[in-house]
């Protein structure tokens, strides 16, 4: 390990955190995971059945809910200090869900199964309360703007935070004019800038969607190649077609690139987008000819979460509070990494070893010096990311760094050298060697592209002479067998069932006791709430 490659800034911060009295701060980082996955039939068709009541109410169950569709489940772990407990929690949620799924399966990869016509993809339903109806109309708006097919892509979201005491410690040694909350927000935004610079590395290491079902494209033009079978499209060197420009494409969002210079400019750009009409949406309006809502408003974004990004600054919201309101009022609390594919070879879609590396990587982004992104850097970051998701395993692939080409493997290895001392520090804090082991596993992938998940997906399809759907169904069946043969303990099962029952009661109570405000007025108040925010 060449420590001299580290910046003086990073070395100073690592030395401070590595002091005996401070090392325990690194044990207090929090990790949470959200995993989306489609429910499918035994024949790999979308399960168009309602969200199983035995899983509770999607509106009020904090661990098992739905994302875009009734068929798209989302599993949410609490934020825990030990990532092993986070992964174990995710595993238990899967086992509970499988106990209630009947003959249905959880789809193993990020890219969807063969989908029915758009009108037959069911939008998630959240009941008759105003907030439930708002969530439903928002999803109708997404269908109108982007189509339902795109909304059926699944992923892993990884939430990470440092303890506030760690930021307070770092602030003491740095010349920063604001208060502790401002410094913490400033530091998380700096983390996001570095994440923009280096997140292509995560796509190389963990991208797992090099192929998809041809029907996903709905006849649109593309540059993919047909291979394996008539219904499979792929790119030979792709790592993550999910994160490529095949996914979300939005003319309305094309000019919306929130500035990550500071929290104020970020929240201002999003607030402007949720308050600025967009002509094609205005022409459609908010209601159809029958007077039914079709979208919440005609602005660039209906709500701030509609903005699609690889990482978000976050703050836990109070009841009825919007994400921007929480950020403006109380600053950034954690980041949500949103670009991770589901690994179809893993029952939960993510492993503890991967989690260890992500911790070290995100911590590197947090602790390394992070100048504001110049215009060419923003452009380079976007083009590097797109290059890696579409052809990251291409031999000799070059990326752009400081406006000069650099070999991907050279740059990736340099980044590994810089992340290694952070992994070592995390290991020292926790009395383990797992973070350094994870670095070695990732370096092996850099040295040999065949070890990447994307290459392994294609190799498995080739070895079994099967297309995308057959491969995905086979993996889904393997994982179903694993979860069904490893049931929860009686107490764990009872706890999940009690939580599901409570969530149904909570939704019923909400619907029964809600103040009588008509939905139009409720939406108007919700929209007005964002216009009244002042930084």
From Swiss-Prot:
EC number per UniProt: 6.3.2.2
Cellular component GO terms held in the UniProt record: cytosol
Biological process, per Gene Ontology: glutathione biosynthetic process
Enzyme class: ligase
Reaction catalyzed: L-cysteine + L-glutamate + ATP = gamma-L-glutamyl-L-cysteine + ADP + phosphate + H(+)
Pathway participation: Sulfur metabolism; glutathione biosynthesis; glutathione from L-cysteine and L-glutamate: step 1/2
Cell cycle keyword on record: no
UniProtKB keywords: ATP-binding, Glutathione biosynthesis, Ligase, Nucleotide-binding
Listed Pfam families: Glu_cys_ligase
Molecular function terms, GO-annotated: ATP binding; glutamate-cysteine ligase activity; metal ion binding
Residues that span the membrane, as ranges: none
Family to which the UniProt record says this protein belongs: Belongs to the glutamate--cysteine ligase type 1 family. Type 1 subfamily.
HAMAP family, A to Z: Glu_cys_ligase
Name of the molecule in the record: Glutamate--cysteine ligase
Organism: Pseudomonas syringae pv. syringae (strain B728a)
Lineage: Bacteria, Pseudomonadati, Pseudomonadota, Gammaproteobacteria, Pseudomonadales
